[in-house]
């Protein structure tokens, strides 16, 4: 595989930069999101290659504008948050080169790798390079992140991504999207996350793929009857996620290691079933599938509603 690319421009609260808080309103966040390219949500199928080579460059000086007046400094792998979504199959080997071009120590923890952490996950200093190799032994969407202390700060500042390892019986679909949920704990304007807010576990904002409300401004587009798969991961660092599509029902659900529902049935109920939400604790993930029966605009949210209103909110435009 090619080295992991970067994509520039990936980062609402509900009611105008509330005086003294520095937190943009939902309208301000949507307006700014409309001006920049969205984080690419659609993911390509896994390649047939058995060895995947990626270089991840750690930096801690990237500025992400959230609105016309509010920005934050994010810590990134390859210049964006979340980091690139990697993909492969069971048995594939991933060869990761971590380059630390930041101003402090950084590291990598790949949940998809079943290996001793002592060397592979150690913190490296600015200017150092680390080689990290693992073979994928189990299917799923697996979190990867910086594991340098304090881990909550490194994750909250943006150093997180996903690795998709396909189940062996994964079926083709018309569209595949990856949604990585992240929390924002805003510090001083232009600065990094606020450690006290992180410890309180009460985020100011939440986002799918790094920018609140970006898929309100740039809706996903599918057609009636097309099969759609959403790969989902809650990268936290703190709060639960309950993924829901308003007006949609999931007929196939794959949750942390296996199917709980296939075409509306499972080993016990032989059809006629459905799912309304996909719940995740931090670092959990899976996928859901559905097709839309009617044209319209469907909204996907975190059904922890205060967090949907704080940015974990997007749209799907369905046409004939």
Please identify what each model-predicted range represents.
Residues 1-320:
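Copper-binding active sites and cupredoxin-like electron-transfer domains
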């Amino acid at each position: 595989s090619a080295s992991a690319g970067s994509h520039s421009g990936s980062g609402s609260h509900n009611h105008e930069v509330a005086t003294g808080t520095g937190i943009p309103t939902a309208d301000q966040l949507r307006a700014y999101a409309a001006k920049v390219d969205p984080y690419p949500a659609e993911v390509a199928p896994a390649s047939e290659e058995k060895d995947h080579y990626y270089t991840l460059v750690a930096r801690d000086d990237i500025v992400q504008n959230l609105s016309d007046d509010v920005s934050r400094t994010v810590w990134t792998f390859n210049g964006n948050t979340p980091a690139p979504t990697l993909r492969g199959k069971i048995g594939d080997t991933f060869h990761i080169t971590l380059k630390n071009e930041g101003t402090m120590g950084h590291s990598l923890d790949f949940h998809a790798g079943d290996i001793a952490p002592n060397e592979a996950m150690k913190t490296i200093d600015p200017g150092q390079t680390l080689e990290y190799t693992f073979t994928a032994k189990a299917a799923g969407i697996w979190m990867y992140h910086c594991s340098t202390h304090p881990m909550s700060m490194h994750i909250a500042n943006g150093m997180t991504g996903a690795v998709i390892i396909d189940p062996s019986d994964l079926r083709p679909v018309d569209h595949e999207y990856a949604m990585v949920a992240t929390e924002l704990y805003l510090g001083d304007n232009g600065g990094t996350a606020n450690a006290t807010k992180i410890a309180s576990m009460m985020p100011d904002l939440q986002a799918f793929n790094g920018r609140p409300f970006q898929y309100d401004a740039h809706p996903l587009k599918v057609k009636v009857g097309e099969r759609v798969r959403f790969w989902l991961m809650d990268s936290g660092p703190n709060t639960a996620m309950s993924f829901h599509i308003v007006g949609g029902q999931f007929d196939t659900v794959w949750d942390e290691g296996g199917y709980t529902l296939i075409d509306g049935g499972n080993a016990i109920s032989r059809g006629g079933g459905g799912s309304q939400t996909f719940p995740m604790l931090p670092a959990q993930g899976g996928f859901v599938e559905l097709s839309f029966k009617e044209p319209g605009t469907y909204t996907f949210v975190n059904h922890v509603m205060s967090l949907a209103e704080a940015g974990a909110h997007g749209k799907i435009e369905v046409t004939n």
